[in-house]
């Protein structure tokens, strides 16, 4: 396309209020309604509107289409704080915002298809390429079901992963295909114990045509060498490999859930007096050494998780910019380091919520208790294949031992 309104824009020079500070101003809304979000099994429209009002979905959206083109680490840091208030809202909002960055990897024409019609459009996604796309004149056709489409009821488009048929003597290639919400139905399949409010339902497509310009292959996305990256050739943000970014947002929800659990636990235990006969009545919980140790362990775990996650995503964006300037290259080892940090930060988060939840007593079983909710939500994050340490850790070990790493990086 030749529309100069889409030309890459220079960075803004006006004073910048960091996104994490803007989240702090609205966090109480999400915290006070976390149980209602869980019970409704979706993030309410009022939450999306509040986040839109503070520019949450613009932070890593390209300036050429009205976004801020900011730092990915800034989104991850803000999403930790948002998830501390409500993990379901953080999971959905983090993905919806990060998908603005992912859309920027597509050809400019695809970006215009989405944002020219609706500058506020948001995208959900279903990442497992379990269906085969059928070749058609000028594109592909999709039919079938795409599960785990988090935030699908809050989105106007979806990124549906599928296998493209091989070209000539080539091999089948996994890819994302952009589909508008008007061309799929949503099947209610999300009835779960953790992250219940993420509306991660199933998309149903029936012979949907997707033009070729709305396709982004996995090899391009995971390497960081994408059509959109070439369009934004001077912006390191849009040349980061896919899996240095998206899983960092997923991990931030687990880290944030643990951070929120710690704050709630300290607030509750600080004024709690025991009633039980075993522990002895009328004793302050805060004076028990075991409680003190659990608080210390959780705090150290949360701090370590934050440090690892934020360090690695900042390193990834800096390295991408250095690659554009010819000063460095983004190697497989660099991509694996990002995957290691993302997953291990969630492992630390699980350690934190386990230490806290194990000592909440009978009152901790109540569904209104934020610690038990954070424990369930953080464990749900840890079940995601991108965060599962058994899957990611073995991949890292394979590489360190001279073997080919088996997994997504």
Curated annotation (Swiss-Prot):
CDD domains according to UniProt: NcnH (cd01159)
Keywords assigned: FAD, Flavoprotein, Monooxygenase, Oxidoreductase
Catalytic activity: resorcinol + FADH2 + O2 = benzene-1,2,4-triol + FAD + H2O + H(+)
One Pfam assignment: Acyl-CoA_dh_N
E.C. number(s) listed in UniProt: 1.14.14.27
Top enzyme category: oxidoreductase
Molecular-function GO term, any one: monooxygenase activity
Annotated SUPFAM superfamilies: Acyl-CoA dehydrogenase C-terminal domain-like, Acyl-CoA dehydrogenase NM domain-like
Transmembrane segments: none
Pathway listed: Aromatic compound metabolism
InterPro entries reported for this sequence: Acyl-CoA_DH_C (IPR013107), Acyl-CoA_Oxase/DH_mid-dom_sf (IPR046373), AcylCo_DH-like_C (IPR036250), AcylCoA_DH/ox_N (IPR013786), AcylCoA_DH/ox_N_sf (IPR037069), AcylCoA_DH/oxidase_NM_dom_sf (IPR009100)
Inducing factors: Induced in the presence of gamma-resorcylate.
Annotated function: Involved in the gamma-resorcylate (2,6-dihydroxybenzoate) catabolism. Oxygenase component of the resorcinol hydroxylase, which catalyzes the FADH(2)-dependent conversion of resorcinol to hydroxyquinol.
PANTHER family for the chain: ACYL-COA DEHYDROGENASE, ISOVALERYL-COA DEHYDROGENASE, MITOCHONDRIAL-RELATED
Self-association and partners: The FADH(2)-dependent resorcinol hydroxylase is composed of two subunits, GraA (the oxygenase component) and GraD (the reductase component). Both subunits are required for activity.
Similarity section: Belongs to the HpaH/HsaA monooxygenase family.
Entry protein name: FADH(2)-dependent resorcinol hydroxylase, oxygenase component
Organism (species): Rhizobium sp. (strain MTP-10005)
Species classification: Bacteria, Pseudomonadati, Pseudomonadota, Alphaproteobacteria, Hyphomicrobiales
